[in-house]
Every structure is written in structure tokens, then in C-alpha cells.
Amino acid sequence: MIESVPQQRPSFFGASRWAQVAVFLVMFVAALAIRVYDITDLPLDFQPTRQLYTAILARGRYYEQLTSAPQEQRDLAIGMRRIEGIESPVFDSIATFSYEVVGQEILWLPRLESAIIWVLAGIFLYLLTRDLTSVDGGLVAVAFYWFAPYGIIASRAFMPDPLTTALSILTWWGLYRWYLKRSWKWVVICGLAAGLAIFTKALAVFPIFGGFLGILLARGLRKSFTDVQFWAMGILTAIPTLIYMFYGFFVQKGLGSDFALRFFPQLWIDPVFYLRWEGMIESVIGLAFFVAALVGIFLYETKEKRWILISYWIAYVIFALTFAYYFSTHDYYHIALVPVVGLSLAPLGELISSRLRQLNPGKWLRFVIIACLVFGLAFNLWNVRNTFHKTDYRPQLAYWQHIGVVLKGHSTTALTQDYGYRLEYLGWILPAAYWPYTGDTALRELAGMAPPDFLSQFKQLTKRSEFFLITDLQELDDQPQLKDYLQTHYPVYEQGTDYLIYDLRTTLPGATP
């Protein structure tokens, strides 16, 4: 049975449509304003490895067109991009286009674009939740989506995840509109949005799958599988991804490495995995909101709506089990949980709103309640503002530029943060080799690979290098064999308070091979 478009219930914020729009616009402006604060800082505040990786790809594309740049610098930027392998070009191409429009590489510009995309997606989340519950339910959902501290920080990251999350929300909304109206217009919107989401980042297949599963279960298997429009949406979703995978696997032949060291089913029976998963949930949305969201699922009024929400959560769990290791170590793998929790909280918001309307508060009591909500929102935004303000990453530019000057023209093996991406992007140095962290070694051991012999590994990774750079002294302490070997075999070429450079061209007197 296809549901009719729902009639809207009254709102606690007033019967006037203009009052509801005003509340939404105030939230919209506040959501955008907090994300713009201190956005010109270096992208090291959130997942710097992933942000700098995207920045390297975008800079390489930009320098391919920047014929006015010095040839040496241009070759280096292009070389850094090519050596990083293949990734869907959607988001870094958007960044490159932005650089070309303004005529220079402005690192914070793609971060601003991510923030705008995330905030705009809140409009579709509101429309979806309003149709599922009410105006006030929609406001609760979008308030959580816009103002959850993790969501604020993650949504302005120079990485494709905010874009894929936004496209997933657009897909969910389009799917529900198709469920209500069943027209070819929504088939095209859903198919294109879902296809672009997965094409932008393959891991978006999970929230997209959740959206399709929800409609499948709400309508019924037989009705959906015999519906040509449902199949058309699936085909439109798959086409861009199949083209990209064909190119990656059979033309460029580098995509296979992106799926290596990903699947670890042995973690499913490890209690530590679930403890880490719980820790990630707490850091991303908070346990109180998590529990409230689970309760909220069952407050939806019809089983069809409950199936839609349950399907989003099923997709989240499948995602967790498929990429168990990264799910327990990388918080941005949980980013789609932010809108899912917002959707799940909506019935609770409507329940509270309904109770307040029944109390029929007078103007002053209504004013006090709204003032409390505003105070809570302002307090939350102030805390996020303080998080942005307390750390200034701009001085790191001079630090990495200095190291780049010292190492320029010399081949280097590096034990350094973010797989060398800070050194590459900020210092303009492409290391000859990257010395693995203890976490990298542990991951390979988890995959059943034997740990390498130290001397063999050292010779292999330094055979073309003149220097050995260490910028993470704590990690050096965590590898005592490496630390002892460097100290007893090679002189220090230069050192600072938080870096060491060993000269591999000269061995210390009495050093044994």
C-alpha cells in the first residue's frame, strides 16, 4: 500500500508557516556560522591523514593545468598525486575547479564547500523527517544533524565524506518521495544521487543500501521486485560505479589495493572490537543520544516507517562488520550515523512537542521554553567554538617548510605523521620510503602476515636514502630497536625540539652492519 502525502501537525513554535520558516532559517544561519569559524586554519584538526591526502590529489590536478608554475614544483605536485594511486576524482576535482576559478590554491576553500554541502543537506533531512513525523520532528532531526559537535567538526573536512553523507540524505529523501508518489521524476533523482554518492566514495554503498532496503521492506518484496521503476533506480545507481570499477581494476589496475587489508571477520568474536565500537559511538554522537535514538525507532507510528529506520541501522551494522578494524579505529567511518540518529530522534521530538501543545502554555511559558532551547544551543556552539580556538595549527606550516628546505634535493626515509602527507603537502618533500608505524605492523599481523626482519626491512627502506627523518619522537620511543640502531650507527645531521634527521651517508666509528 502506497501511503498518501502526510498532513502536517501543528508546531509548538506556532501555527504560522512564517514562524516555522523563521526558526529553520535561524538554525540554518547558526549551523553555517559555526562551521565558518577559524576555517582558514590548516586542516589538521580532524583526520589530518585523510584531509591532506585529498589536498595532495587536488593540488596535483591543479598543477597539471598551472603551466605558469615553476617546472620543478609542478612536476613534484603532479608526481605526488600520481604516486598516491587511484581514487574517485569527484571531490578533489571540485576543489581543483575552485582553485582555478579563484586563480590560486586556497586550502580552506574546499573545507568551506564541504560545510555548505553538509548544511544544505539538512534541508532534505528536514523534508524527509517532516514527512515521516511532523514539523517539530523535522526540526529536532535537523537540529541534531546540524549541531552535534562531531558533525560540526567533521562536516568541514577536506575529504569526500561530507559530500557522500549529503548525497545519501538526498537519496533517502528521494526514495521516500518515490514511495509516496511513485513517479519517474523521483526515479531519476534517486538513481543519480545514489550513483554519484557511491561514485564519490565506494563506502557510501552502505547508507545507500540502507535506503533501498527500507523502501523494499516497507513496500514488500514482491511489489518492489516486480516494479520496473525500482529496478531503474538500481541500474542508475550502479552505472557510475561500474564504470569507475572497470577503469580502476582493468585500465589503471590500481583499485585492487584500495580493498586490501580491510576485511577482518576474526574481530567479530573479539570483545575488544565491541568496546572500541562503543567508544566510537560515544565520541561521534554520545551514548545518551544513541540510546534515545534506538528507542525513537519504535515510536514511529506505522510499521512501514519503522522498517525504513530499522534498515538504516541494519546498513550501519553491516558496514561495521564488513570493515571491523577501521570501524573501531577511524571515527569518520561512523559519519553517516549523525543523520541516522537525527532521524531516529524525530519521534521523541514530536512526542515532547505534542505534550507541550497539550499543556497549552501561555506566551511567557512558551518564551521561557524557547529561551531554554536557545541557551542550550548557544552553550553547545560556544563549546565547539572553543575547540576550534584552543589549537592554532598555522605555525606548523613554517615547521614543515623548514624541514623541506633541509631535505630538498636529498632522498629521505621518514618516520612521520600521516603517512608522510604533512611532509609532502606542507614541506614539498616526497620521501623515498615511509617507515611503518607500530599500528601498521599490527594491522599486517592481524591479516596473518609475518612481521618483517628488522635489518632486512631497514636495508630495503633506506637503500636509496641519504637521510632518515623522524618527526614523531613518541613513535620512535615505541620502536626501541629502530631507535637504538639509528643512535649506534648514524650521526645526527640536524635536530630540533620535535624532529631528528640522521645522516645515512656516514656510519659511526665501530658501528656493526
Predicted ranges, named:
Residues 109-132, 170-174:
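Transmembrane-helix motifs of polytopic, lipid-linked glycan transferases
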